[in-house]
């Protein structure tokens, strides 16, 4: 589902009837209000989501939390904590591995939301936040632990 029909009740009911897991590509910084119209209590996988940056040379601004130091990591921690807290969300997939080139891909999209930039230089703080979140996922989801404490 990649269009305005995302939250049409009939599509969600039909998806839940024939799919074990329903997936969405969404880019919010929080999932507290995520409740697809007509979707019963079935597992949901967020198959494409990200937090961008405004500090590494690209112009696209999808889910860009700002340019101040640490903004991207704090936004990622908030996004992941929100997803991990949602009772229906069973996973969230980061899109994508590399930043997009400045001149854009085939459709002109040129976002800076990769784990590495276009020269394969890792965003080490962002990778560390992802790693820490992955390590804490199960204890947090089970209620036995707290989530990331970022400055």
Predicted regions and their residues:
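Long, C-terminal catalytic modules of enzymes
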Residues: 69, 77-111
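Alpha-helical structural signal in soluble globular domains
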Residues: 13, 18, 82, 86, ...
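Glycoside hydrolase catalytic-domain groove-lining segments
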Residues: 2-63, 77, 81
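A short acidic, glycine-rich active-site loop
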Residues: 64-71
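Aromatic-rich peripheral "rim/lid" segments of glycoside hydrolase catalytic domains that contact
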Residues: 95-151
């Amino acid at each position: 589902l990649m269009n305005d029909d995302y939250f049409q009740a009939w599509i969600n009911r039909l998806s839940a009837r024939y799919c074990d897991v329903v997936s969405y590509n969404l880019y919010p910084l929080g999932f507290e209000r995520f409740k697809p119209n007509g979707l019963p209590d079935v597992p949901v996988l967020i198959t494409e989501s990200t937090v961008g940056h405004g500090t590494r040379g690209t112009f696209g601004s999808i889910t860009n939390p700002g340019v101040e130091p640490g903004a991207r990591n704090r936004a990622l921690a908030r996004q992941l904590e929100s997803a991990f807290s949602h009772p229906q969300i069973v996973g969230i997939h980061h899109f994508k591995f590399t930043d997009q080139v400045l001149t854009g891909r085939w459709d002109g999209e040129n976002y800076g939301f990769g784990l590495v930039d276009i020269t394969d230089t890792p965003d080490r703080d962002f990778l560390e936040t992802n790693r820490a979140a992955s390590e804490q996922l199960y204890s947090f989801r089970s209620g036995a632990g707290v989530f990331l404490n970022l400055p």
